[in-house]
Amino acid sequence: MHFLTSEEMEKAYLSGLTSENDMYPEVYNENVYGKAAMTACSYGGKLYGYPVSFNTSFLVYNKKYAEAVDTIDQIRNISDNYQITDENQDVSMVFEWDPDSMFLNYAAAGAYINIGGVNAENRAEVSLNEEKIKKVLTKYAQLKDAFGIDRNTVSLKDCADLFSTGNMLYTVLDADSLAEINVTDVDYGICEYPSMGDDLDSKAMSVTTMAVVNPYTKNVDASKAVARAISYDYADYLGSMAKKSCARADLKVKRAESYQKLHQIYSDSVVKAKYIGVGEVYMRYEIMLHQVYDGGNVDTAYSTFATTIEKTTKNNNENSTQNTK
């Protein structure tokens, strides 16, 4: 048995290192783990992985002083009108986040980018909604002036540290960062990454870590039982011992409301594409975000991104065709 992330699924499958997850259908389904987990752990229509943990991005807020929001404009309005009182004097910042991270901010335009199709594995299926993405980029470019955040000086850890002390109202985190907050007394809520406008949606990316059984092992059934034990039977130990967000969605936990919301976001998320060579696409998305945030022209940044995606997709298709001959 070995562990891998969902983006490594195709490589593992083509290397012959995946044995089908077929012994426990009553356990490994969307009712227990959610849609994204099942998609991430599958390839070619068959389930191979045993989902263990996941990572995704979302907005977290301090429930003592703040409420859930839907859009970035709502946060801007709160920031512009926020007043310090005796009750909230511990708060030193309304909102800060890491604008440099592709993974955190994929959600900004994630609803309008299709990479790999519904199963995140078809290299021939890549599509972009130009109109919507440009609207997202236009608003994203305004955030630097709105919040005065230099993307080169603010990190995810900085934001998690500040939020965990109760000194910030809102920030964007990933699931791995929750371990730091869960050991504090901060009463927090979780909601989707804020959309860039009332007429726009956000959709976070997720990566799933899974156990996979090697078909060449001496006892495949025993290995499958161990994979089940790790990902299901003893899944509740993952958060307390490994400080990871458990992929199993039906556990009873201390912060049940936040846990359920996090799993809803995870289940509905965009699964990071699983095919070999897709890394170039995400790197180009990150570059596009950086360009517009730093003051670059939106049309130019998008055009460069779209052209590169088209070329990369074409090259991937040609390589795939050659490999099948």
Show which residues each predicted segment covers.
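Conserved C-terminal helix/tail region of periplasmic/extracytoplasmic solute-binding proteins
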Residues: 263-325
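Extracytoplasmic/periplasmic solute-binding protein
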Residues: 46-52, 57, 76-125, 168
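Hinge/lid segment of periplasmic solute-binding proteins
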Residues: 3-58, 73, 190-194
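A ligand-binding cleft/hinge motif common to bilobed small-molecule-binding domains
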Residues: 7-13, 173-187
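Glycine-centered hinge/linker elements that transmit conformational signals in sensory
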Residues: 122-153
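Extracytoplasmic/periplasmic substrate-recognition and gating elements
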Residues: 183-243, 287
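Short helices/loops that flank or line small-molecule/ion binding pockets
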Residues: 2, 15, 80-84, 156-171, ...
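Short glycine- and hydrophobic/aromatic-rich loop-to-beta-strand nucleating segment
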Residues: 57-60, 211-213
